[in-house]
């Protein structure tokens, strides 16, 4: 992949010209990229792109690297957005915008809004919406802070949910990613608590709230949803069998 980037050629071309030597400039450029990779820097940051839900997205160190398991959240959301229905959909903590853009791409009639507290992340998200020619409203704010009086028929989120003391934070890709987008407090649930507590004031009655969480957090998430008056709580496993997403429907008496 690094050599493809340096030479601007695909793998088929490289295979057909395997006996040809690259010039000195290309060799130096490749060596620099290889050094970054050797130092552990994620390939997505080196190349500046990552595929998600069949689409290529621009990625910078200002945002998390999209994971395949997050596609489950997109699939569950799409099941709740009828084709050609102008549903009001909100993506909280949008980061690179992959969830919002994928939903807008798959459901062009949906009215998708995305929020993030970080201006740099929103810049990446806006660029990705432009890249894929979709209309998404973007707001900078802390969860619902910029959305006073607005209500939605579906809210989705992939919030920070890693516990502050998790040893994995200093390993592999996580060591290079923005910690504010990963860490959700001492137990990893601070952001989920805030979302669950406040979402009821922004959901239509019966509307769904869906969010990704850690492998061992589904029980705590179900308890939070129940405590705030949501109904029909459910959790879903990813392709590896790990419970990855939980959600529920808002009721008339959701606690504000």
Model-derived features: where do they sit?
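Conserved AdoMet
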Residues: 1-79
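Residue-level signal for inorganic ion chemistry
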Residues: 2, 40, 70, 99, ...
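Solvent-exposed beta-strand sheet faces enriched in polar/charged residues
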Residues: 46-49, 58, 139, 212, ...
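Conserved beta-strand segments of alpha/beta enzyme cores
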Residues: 56, 111, 135-137, 231-234
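Conserved SAM/SAH cofactor-binding pocket of Class I
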Residues: 69-168, 194
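Mobile active-site "lid"/loop adjacent to the S-adenosyl-L-methionine
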Residues: 161-191
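Conserved Class I SAM-dependent methyltransferase catalytic core
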Residues: 186-249
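Flexible, glycine-/basic-rich loop-and-beta segments that form/coincide
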Residues: 252-256
């Amino acid at each position: 992949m690094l050599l493809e980037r340096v030479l601007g050629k695909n793998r088929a071309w490289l295979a057909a010209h395997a006996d040809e030597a690259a010039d000195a400039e290309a060799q130096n450029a490749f060596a620099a990229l290889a050094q970054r990779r050797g130092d552990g820097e994620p390939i997505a940051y080196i190349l500046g792109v990552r595929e998600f839900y069949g689409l290529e997205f621009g990625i910078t160190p200002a945002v998390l690297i999209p994971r395949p398991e997050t596609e489950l959240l997109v699939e569950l959301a799409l099941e709740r957005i009828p084709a050609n229905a102008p549903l009001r959909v909100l993506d909280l903590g949008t980061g690179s915008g992959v969830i919002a853009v994928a939903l807008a791409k798959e459901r062009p009639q949906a009215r998708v809004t995305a929020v993030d507290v970080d201006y740099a992340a929103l810049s990446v998200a806006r660029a990705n919406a432009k890249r894929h020619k979709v209309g998404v409203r973007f707001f900078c704010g802390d969860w619902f802070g910029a959305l006073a009086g607005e209500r939605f028929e579906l809210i989705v989120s992939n919030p920070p949910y890693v516990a502050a003391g998790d040893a994995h934070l200093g390993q592999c890709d996580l060591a290079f990613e923005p910690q504010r987008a990963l860490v959700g407090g001492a137990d990893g649930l601070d952001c989920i608590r805030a979302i669950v507590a406040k979402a009821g004031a922004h959901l239509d009655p019966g509307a769904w709230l869906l969010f990704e969480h850690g492998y061992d957090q589904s029980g705590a998430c179900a308890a939070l949803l129940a405590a705030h008056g949501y109904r029909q709580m459910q959790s879903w496993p990813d392709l590896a069998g790990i419970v990855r997403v939980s959600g529920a429907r808002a009721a008339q008496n959701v606690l504000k």
